[in-house]
């Protein structure tokens, strides 16, 4: 197996994919809100891989190879990313490119 992609590069890649796909997967109001507030409140952060991904993707997720990135807006009062626009499962193996996104639904 190749050396895993760094955490920072994984987050950057996830964010780039999010920006490309957001207009087709989020409500227009959410795209406008995210774009307008990202500079002040936006975040893309790596979190522990959720146990629900196995059911979502149909295979057993290796938590050493895959990462979960959450993208959204941080609550200014408590500095918590609580308005999540997307959860992404992304492979950190450069030879095994994969991502799966769960989008915010109102």
From Swiss-Prot:
Q: Which family does it belong to?
A: Belongs to the putative dsDNA mimic protein family.
The record ties this protein, via Pfam families, to: DUF440
Q: What is the lineage of its organism?
A: Bacteria, Pseudomonadati, Pseudomonadota, Gammaproteobacteria, Vibrionales
- Domain of life the protein comes from: Bacteria
This protein's species is: Vibrio cholerae serotype O1 (strain ATCC 39315 / El Tor Inaba N16961)
Return the protein name.
Putative double-stranded DNA mimic protein VC_1208
Q: What does this protein do?
A: May act as a double-stranded DNA (dsDNA) mimic. Probably regulates the activity of a dsDNA-binding protein.
């Amino acid at each position: 197996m190749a050396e895993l992609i760094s955490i920072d590069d994984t987050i950057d890649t996830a964010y780039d994919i999010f920006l490309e796909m957001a207009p087709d997967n989020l409500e227009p109001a959410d795209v406008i809100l995210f774009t307008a507030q990202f500079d002040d409140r936006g975040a893309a952060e790596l979190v522990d891989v959720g146990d629900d991904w196995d059911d979502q993707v149909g295979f057993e997720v290796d938590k050493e190879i895959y990462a979960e990135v959450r993208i959204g807006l941080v609550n200014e009062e408590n500095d918590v990313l609580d308005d999540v626009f997307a959860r992404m499962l992304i492979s950190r193996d450069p030879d095994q490119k994969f991502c799966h996104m769960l989008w915010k639904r109102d």
